[in-house]
Amino acid sequence: MLTVQEVEKFFMRPSGDYVFARWGRPIAAVVFGVLDESLSIIKSAVEAVCLASGHTTSELDPDIGSNLMVFFFKDWSELLEVPDLEHIIPNLEILLEKLETAEANQYRIFRFDETGGIKACFVFLRMDNALKKLNAENLALIQVVKAMLVWSDLAFQNASPLALRENGETVLRPEIAALLKAAYDPTMPPKSNDPSHALRMAARITVR
């Protein structure tokens, strides 16, 4: 379904470095800046993508309570008003200035455990016109997929991780679902910087 070279591209940095990491613990999500009905949509997306990946969710992380934090807002400067966020995100003001200058509409920050696996992810979404065009379900699914692994910055630049069925239902693209399943295979490491990891991933995708 995916060649080794295609798998590599999902995790290859512009520098030529191969960078892969997956979650090393159940995902406990919390969402800020949305109404209650949107909250349930996002949590349903987390559960659906974790189920497709073979990963798990939890109500609470024993160390930090919530380990996937998703923030929705209209302007980057709003994050300066979030209590204690500057303690979680180093050099927050400088980062926000860069994102504002670049007119970015999203940004993700990962934290890792001693094995190199993901232990926390912070997702920031500035709801510009491009993001507003997406319905809530699709936006939630896309963002959860992007938070499931440490992807290349270009991984989804030219194609969404979602596909539309003939009946109008939105689902993960089959190759993305297969890639996530391979990434969360218990025999695979939580982190790798070795391009041969892509070969092992591709082999697991092929046999499914």
Where do the protein language model's features map onto the residues?
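Long alpha-helical, hydrophobic tracts
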Residues: M1-M69, K74-E78
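Long, folded non-catalytic interaction modules
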Residues: E37-I42, S58-I142
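Short, Lys/Arg-enriched charge-dense amphipathic segments
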Residues: I42-S53, E78-L92, A177-P189
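Glycine-rich loops and low-complexity Gly/Arg-rich segments
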Residues: A52-T57, E93-E97, A147-W151
